[in-house]
Swiss-Prot record:
It is found in: Cytoplasm. GTP binds at residues 23-30. This is Urease accessory protein UreG. The lineage of its organism: Bacteria, Pseudomonadati, Pseudomonadota, Betaproteobacteria, Burkholderiales. Facilitates the functional incorporation of the urease nickel metallocenter. This process requires GTP hydrolysis, probably effectuated by UreG. The gene is ureG. It comes from Bordetella pertussis (strain Tohama I / ATCC BAA-589 / NCTC 13251).
Amino acid sequence: MHDISSLTTRTKALPPLRVGVGGPVGSGKTTLLEMVCKAMYPQFDLIAITNDIYTKEDQRLLTLSGALPPERILGVETGGCPHTAIREDASINLIAIDQMLEQFPDADIVFVESGGDNLAATFSPELSDLTLYIIDVASGEKIPRKGGPGITKSDLFIINKTDLAPYVGADLAVMEADTRRMRGDKPFVMCNLKTGDGLDQVIAFLKTEGLFRG
């Protein structure tokens, strides 16, 4: 958790939970964020920061989806490798978080969606308290066993688009077995965000491991 001394108008005892959402291009990061926000807001006070290299496309899509009120979504143009802005030099995102918390000092969760990146991407502990890493079945059955920090070290690993398995020749049982082997006891979810299948497990994880952790 983070120091809240600078949040002079915050009335809640605990600092906001910072949740990093990472994964390759097209895996479903923005859709995941949309679905989670729609399910948890306004019961929980949420803000979201999206990262794109040259545009603010994810901010636009998230806003159009109605996931949150527009003023609660901020787009960041990283202008370089996506992982740099969430790991080596997270300053652009830290500034964005501070900016949003000035407007919404009682936020329960700050979501930070990274730009699409490779399996080596990971969030700086300074930026994220919990990390969600998402891949999609259409990228290939072999992805879980390729490893990488997103797969092996994320707090929750999400395999999306399970409905596409028959069309791309992917065996979900193999993907699940490989995931268990690579992650050990760390949790993962097989889901289809298009239908909402598996979303409840993601939300339960955020509540039990983040918001309501003893």
